[in-house]
UniProtKB/Swiss-Prot annotation:
Taxonomic source organism: Dictyostelium discoideum
Name assigned to this protein: Signal recognition particle 14 kDa protein
GO molecular function per UniProt: 7S RNA binding; endoplasmic reticulum signal peptide binding
4Fe-4S keyword on record: no
Chain positions covered by the region annotation Disordered: 99-123
Length: 123
């Protein structure tokens, strides 16, 4: 569902809140080009038109069931980024810190001495 920027951010906030206990929200951003949607034209014509267009960013978010999206214009980019950052700071407070796996303390030289000691006892 295509929303305007403010409605998208409020819907994104609701998505994060509904999945706060259990679930995941995926957010993707990519360059949006209007002329790519019309494939019947020749490629050269589409490239010429895309050079004249204003840069836009397509932002999508989903929790697996509900999908939302918006198109951010270049002139609105800084305001959208500030508001998006605020939504993230509010909702990403329960991130898990992954523990590093401990490295083995045995060195290769100690394991080889154990093998040679075992061989000596067999003989």
């Amino acid at each position: 569902m295509l929303l305007d920027n403010d409605a998208f951010l409020s819907a994104l906030n609701k998505l994060y809140q509904t999945t706060s206990k259990k679930g995941t929200v995926w957010v993707t951003m990519k360059k949006y080009v209007d002329s790519d949607s019309n494939f019947s034209r020749k490629k050269a014509e589409r490239i010429k038109e895309s050079e004249e267009e204003e840069n836009k960013c397509l932002v999508r978010a989903t929790n697996g069931k509900k999908k939302i999206s918006t198109i951010v214009l270049a002139k609105d980019k800084s305001m959208f980024e500030k508001n998006y950052k605020n939504v993230l700071l509010i909702n990403l407070d329960n991130l898990k810190v992954e523990k590093k796996k401990p490295t083995p303390t045995t060195t290769p030289s100690s394991s080889t001495t154990a093998k040679t000691a075992a061989k000596k006892t067999k003989v």
